[in-house]
């Protein structure tokens, strides 16, 4: 990725939009639809680069996936009829694809190799490999920590596992592997992490029990799977950039429709409310994956906040743009307990601080988060996404605080999760 993008957008931002389908749910819907023999339809999926890597891999395994307007039609021969791949399964920049398929392919017992791009090659996999090996998975990485991951057939066993970190990807890798075990698996979480895997298991007829921080699987649960249609809500992680953009840009009034507000993912709404931001939810739906329309209006004099504990996993992917929001508060804000940011596409603690500090903001990285001081855009230094889609979009939102254009290197990284992000932002500028 070498492209540079000059961002020249000014407020106010006004209008009504939808954001692309939720990335986490799209991945899981493709995986479960591919396992189930028959036809499943996924409506309004995210067709960014990450989810396309998941689609490509299941096509190699023998699943037919057709793109039709705003839906995917998945026709599967069933998991028992999957091909043995004769080439490396390329996961690109997708940590979700890599980690969840490490569990799923181990459970299936399909001899395979998972490998991604340079960024994925730097992201540690030991946190996934340890529990999978305790389930008797035959899986190895380079130096036992990194991709490529080499998977060979084995008989998966149930385990009683206490999570070491609040990670939905690690939890989901265990859950996908457990589908093929003759024993139940029990997972004890440290804090509540996003529960899309659990809710979507049920949607595809797979029994699973969750109570508090404990999750219990059913032996050989894969036998219950059935094809299903699934409507993917808008991704709250993508909506977050427009929420913050409207809050910090004078005169803005933006409404985002059909956003997923799963309580394990809605931390940004909680944070904005605690800061006194003008945010309203309406048109709410209930169910396993609730949705709402969200209206956001410019809010001066935002209150500082300390983000820690159980709030962190509920907003983990939004923390870079939340850090930008905190620069506009009237006092110093702190993010704690966010070590998980270190193992994202970049070390997001460092990249958030480094890039925003280049623009004149004042952030101090800590071992587990950030200290964010009230500060303003001071200089139009060239900044860099460092191939991290969320850093690229956060920097584009930061440009709204500048009176001059801002140049962002490697901006095409945003296509990982939000193709069309910049045109949508410009649409709100034009309506404003």
Swiss-Prot record:
The active site is at residue 317. GO terms for molecular function: 3-phosphoshikimate 1-carboxyvinyltransferase activity. GO terms for cellular component: cytoplasm. Keywords: Amino-acid biosynthesis, Aromatic amino acid biosynthesis, Cytoplasm, Transferase. SUPFAM superfamilies: EPT/RTPC-like (SSF55205). It is an enzyme of class 2 (transferase). Its EC number is 2.5.1.19. Its main location: cytoplasm. 3-phosphoshikimate binds at residues 23-24, 28, 167, 169, 317, 344. It comes from the Bacteria. It is found in: Cytoplasm. Pathway: Metabolic intermediate biosynthesis; chorismate biosynthesis; chorismate from D-erythrose 4-phosphate and phosphoenolpyruvate: step 6/7. It catalyses: 3-phosphoshikimate + phosphoenolpyruvate = 5-O-(1-carboxyvinyl)-3-phosphoshikimate + phosphate. The keyword DNA-binding does not apply. Phosphoenolpyruvate binds at residues 23, 95, 123, 169, 348, 390. CDD domains: EPSP_synthase. The keyword Signal does not apply. One of its GO terms (biological process) is chorismate biosynthetic process. Belongs to the EPSP synthase family. NCBIfam families: aroA. Monomer. Catalyzes the transfer of the enolpyruvyl moiety of phosphoenolpyruvate (PEP) to the 5-hydroxyl of shikimate-3-phosphate (S3P) to produce enolpyruvyl shikimate-3-phosphate and inorganic phosphate. This is 3-phosphoshikimate 1-carboxyvinyltransferase. It comes from Staphylococcus aureus (strain bovine RF122 / ET3-1). The gene is aroA.
């Amino acid at each position: 990725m070498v492209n540079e993008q000059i961002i020249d957008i000014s407020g106010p931002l006004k209008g009504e939009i939808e954001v692309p389908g939720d990335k986490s749910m799209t991945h899981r819907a493709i995986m479960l639809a591919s396992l189930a023999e028959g036809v499943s339809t996924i409506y309004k999926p995210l067709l960014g680069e990450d989810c396309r890597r998941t689609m490509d891999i299941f096509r190699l395994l023998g699943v037919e996936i057709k793109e039709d307007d705003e839906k995917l039609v998945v026709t599967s021969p069933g998991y028992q009829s999957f091909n043995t791949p004769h080439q490396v399964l390329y996961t690109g920049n997708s940590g979700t694809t890599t980690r969840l398929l490490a569990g799923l392919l181990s459970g299936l017992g399909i001899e395979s190799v998972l490998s991604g791009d340079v960024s994925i090659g730097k992201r540690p996999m030991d946190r996934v490999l340890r529990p999978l090996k305790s389930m008797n998975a035959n899986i190895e990485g380079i130096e036992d920590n990194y991709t490529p991951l080499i998977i060979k057939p084995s008989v998966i066993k149930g385990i009683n596992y206490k999570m070491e970190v609040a990670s939905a990807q690690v939890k989901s890798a265990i859950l996908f592997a457990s589908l093929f075990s003759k024993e139940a698996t029990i997972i004890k979480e440290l804090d509540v992490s996003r529960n899309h895997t659990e809710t979507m298991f049920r949607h595809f007829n797979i029994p699973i029990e969750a109570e508090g921080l404990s999750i219990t699987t059913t032996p050989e649960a894969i036998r219950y799977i059935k094809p299903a249609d699934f409507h993917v809500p808008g991704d709250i992680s993508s909506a977050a950039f427009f929420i913050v953009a409207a809050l910090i840009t004078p005169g803005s009034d933006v409404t985002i429709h059909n956003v997923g507000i799963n309580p394990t993912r809605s931390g940004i709404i909680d944070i904005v409310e605690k800061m006194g931001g003008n945010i309203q939810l309406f048109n709410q739906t209930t169910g396993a994956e609730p949705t709402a329309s969200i209206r956001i209006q410019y809010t001066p004099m935002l209150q500082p906040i300390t983000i820690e504990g159980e709030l962190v996993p509920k907003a983990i992917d939004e923390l870079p743009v939340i850090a930008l929001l905190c620069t506009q508060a009237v006092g110093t804000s702190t993010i704690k307990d966010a070590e998980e940011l270190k193992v994202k596409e970049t070390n997001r603690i460092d990249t958030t601080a480094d890039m925003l500090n280049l623009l004149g903001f004042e952030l101090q990285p800590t071992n587990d988060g950030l200290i964010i001081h009230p500060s303003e855009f001071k200089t139009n230094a060239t900044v860099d996404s460092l191939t991290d889609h969320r850093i690229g979009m956060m920097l584009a939102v930061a440009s709204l605080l500048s009176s001059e254009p801002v140049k962002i290197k490697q901006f095409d990284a945003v296509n990982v999760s939000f193709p069309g992000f910049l045109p949508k932002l410009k649409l709100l500028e034009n309506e404003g």
